[in-house]
Amino acid sequence: MYLSDFLYIVPEITVLGSALALLVLGMFTSERRVRSMSLISVAIAAVLACKELIYFSGEEVSLFGGFVVRTAHTCLARAVVAVSGLFAFLLFFFAKRSYRYEFAVLMLFAFLGTLTLVEAHHFLSFYLSFELIGFASYILVCFNRSSIKASEAAIKFFVLGALSSCIMLYGISLVYGYASEFSLGVVSKVLGGEESLGATFGCALVLVGLLFKLGAVPFHMWIPDTYEGAPTVAVVFFTIVTKTAMVLVFAGLMQGVVIPITGFVWSMLLMAALSMVVGEFSAMQQKNVKRLFAYANIGHIGYVLAGMSTGVVTFKPVLFYVVTYLLINVWIFTVLLRYDDEGFEITDVAGLAAKNPFLAFTFVAALLASAGLPPFSGFFAKYTLLKAIGGVDAFGVPTLVCVVFLCLTSIIPCFYCFRIAKVVYFDVPTGEHSATSRNVGLSIMAFVAVTLSLVVVLLRERII
């Protein structure tokens, strides 16, 4: 281990130092100031991570005795996660919510976990990062102690999360028993040479833990209740930061460790199809807005799994899809954060066009982008992913079936998006819940998200 190794993890050191400092300073300063300082530390980390990506030489470097490996994939993943974290903290900063200062500190610790997770190259650092995200997330969900729904959601999340962590840890022990090594690079070489029942089962258990965090069917049970009960700011973090990190980590494992074991490919394709069907059809039946988006995100995970299951060639389209929907989710949450944390039903946006035409247009446009209708960015993301999956011949009929499922389930979001649009423009206001007063910060965030979505679409040929 050399001192130069620490230069690579300066973004992580910045976030960790800020979290520890604010944990103490929060007792002597205002919550607003803690929120501002946490945003500054995340912005610094994002700038440093992007700088590391820009100046990356392309040479693979092992750091801290193999616990961290600097590659093109890890540098790119860390930069994407850091920028997503910056978006999440900006939304947190502009949202007119009053939380205790520990909320910002917990978000910093969870953000630190996502940064270390995407660059982990050792099962020990991988699992510790996984748990750091988990423990911070459990507390964020139940932060509103007076809410029964939040407490119920946190208990479900904690119990199922603990179970998934145990399963993952058992899988890691099985893989170690076969490969006699915790390094992901060595494990991938061993599994690529010869398969065994023990190693295959161990990899499957490790993937179960990740699939739980992703919310793929049949490991999605915690998602709807957690989204409904948790503070909206926490949901923002889970959707924008945690999901992005988990997808990028899962993509790395699929390419390096799992793809050589061909039996996993069929399982991934099956879970992709189930996630698309269950997510989109369940979203049609929801009345609560946050539950609806929870199921919609399950459907999006199905699309991502379909892309990753077909091999290395489709990673860039998956990355394009993830970045595009990251920006769309930022766009959507600039509207959702104007409403109360609890009891946000679809009927609460009735007549929004009459009260706030700009907000109504922003909300409906974001929904149409999420549904994947042209000419919005979501359409190009789904089309690019579909084109990439359809161009892979290695897996024959299962891939064809997955393409059919993707096409059919892409139509379903139009139903509930147009239903919400109808409520926004034509229904009579109920008056029970209404959006908070004009929020210039969130409006600017919406404009930035739309602009970046347009830029990403225009530059998609270079990205892919």
From Swiss-Prot:
NDH-1 is composed of 14 different subunits. Subunits NuoA, H, J, K, L, M, N constitute the membrane sector of the complex. One of its GO terms (molecular function) is NADH dehydrogenase (ubiquinone) activity. Keywords: Cell inner membrane, Cell membrane, Membrane, NAD, Quinone, Translocase, Transmembrane, Transmembrane helix, Transport, Ubiquinone. It is a multi-pass membrane protein. The chain crosses the membrane at residues 6-26, 36-56, 75-95, 101-121, 123-143, 157-177, 197-217, 231-253, 257-279, 293-313, 317-337, 360-380, 395-415, 439-459. One of its GO terms (biological process) is ATP synthesis coupled electron transport. One of its GO terms (cellular component) is plasma membrane. It is found in: Cell inner membrane. Belongs to the complex I subunit 2 family. HAMAP family: NDH1_NuoN_1 (MF_00445). It is an enzyme of class 7 (translocase). NDH-1 shuttles electrons from NADH, via FMN and iron-sulfur (Fe-S) centers, to quinones in the respiratory chain. The immediate electron acceptor for the enzyme in this species is believed to be ubiquinone. Couples the redox reaction to proton translocation (for every two electrons transferred, four hydrogen ions are translocated across the cytoplasmic membrane), and thus conserves the redox energy in a proton gradient. Its EC number is 7.1.1.-. This is NADH-quinone oxidoreductase subunit N. It catalyses: a quinone + NADH + 5 H(+)(in) = a quinol + NAD(+) + 4 H(+)(out). The keyword Membrane applies.
